[in-house]
Amino acid sequence: MTEQEDTFSAVRFHKSSGLQNEMRLKETRKPEKARLRVCSVPWQLIVIALGILISLRLVTVAVLMTNIFQYGQQKHELKEFLKHHNNCSIMQSDINLKDELLKNKSIECNLLESLNRDQNILCDKTRTVLDYLQHTGRGVKVYWFCYGMKCYYFVMDRKPWSRCKQSCQNSSLTLLKIDDEDELKFLQLVVPSDSCWIGLSYDNKKKDWAWIDNRPSKLALNTTKYNIRDGGCMFLSKTRLDNNYCDQSFICICGKRLDKFPH
């Protein structure tokens, strides 16, 4: 073999060795790149998944904030509605109460008008009775007035209890029956300074004090303090209600309720 052939063979061998080495190097790098590509794929998926999760959370938070805001607004509107409704209810209650008061006032006015009519009728009839007594010569000094549902007649001619009873009956009246404590206090303010017979006496059959109509009264009397030995008839003065002997002569108090007087 010549020198040129040896040189050519050496060059070819060198080139082929270099090519083989380069081929091996490329083949060695290919799996590494493949591994890198394979390894990079899961990270991309994780990043995408995380992005999706974060986006979903942001959307969820936004929805929650929107709902919270709407709930707060609805709650405020509900409070305003309830407040307005309560105000309307209160106003309606006030209107109903005022209507009821007006209705009661109207009823009271009608009752007062009726009482005034009855009182005027009774006063006219009373004047007729008094005028008749005076014209027949049986008239005596009398003064009278009406208060509430009752009219009072003070016969100033002093008489025993039985004659006072008769004088009242002659005028279609009765000796006064006191209905309650308020009436007693009122009468003590208006009675004359002298003692006045009233329609309360001791009933020997019942062994107790009884009013002229034999009916109970709301006037609470401690009858135990009245000794029958001091008298069996009751009189009224400005300071007290007490008993005395029935033959004593006092002023007479006659009375009559408006609803008992004939129309």
Curated annotation (Swiss-Prot):
Sugar-bearing residue positions: 87, 104, 170, 222
Q: Which PROSITE patterns match?
A: C_TYPE_LECTIN_2
GO term, biological process aspect, one: cell adhesion
Please provide, in alphabetical order, the Gene Ontology terms of the cellular component aspect for this entry: cell surface; external side of plasma membrane; plasma membrane
Task: Tell me the residue ranges located in the Cytoplasmic compartment per UniProt.
Answer: 1-44
Q: How does it sit in the membrane?
A: Single-pass type II membrane protein
Q: What is the effect of changing residue 35 to G?
A: In strain: NOD and NOR
What Pfam families does its record include? Lectin_C, Ly49
**Disulfide links within the chain:** 146-151, 164-252, 168-254, 233-246
Keyword flag Transmembrane = yes
Q: Which GO terms fall under molecular function for this chain's record?
A: carbohydrate binding
Membrane spanning stretches: 45-65
Domain C-type lectin positions:
139-258
Tell me the keywords, alphabetical order: Cell adhesion, Cell membrane, Disulfide bond, Glycoprotein, Lectin, Membrane, Receptor, Signal-anchor, Transmembrane, Transmembrane helix
- Major subcellular location class: membrane
Which ranges sit in the Extracellular compartment?
Answer: 66-263
Localization? Cell membrane
Subunit details: Homodimer; disulfide-linked. Interacts with the adapter protein TYROBP/DAP12; the interaction leads to natural killer cell activation.
Q: What does this protein do?
A: Receptor on natural killer (NK) cells for class I MHC.
* Matches recorded under PANTHER family: KILLER CELL LECTIN-LIKE RECEPTOR 2, KILLER CELL LECTIN-LIKE RECEPTOR 4-RELATED
Protein name as annotated: Killer cell lectin-like receptor 4
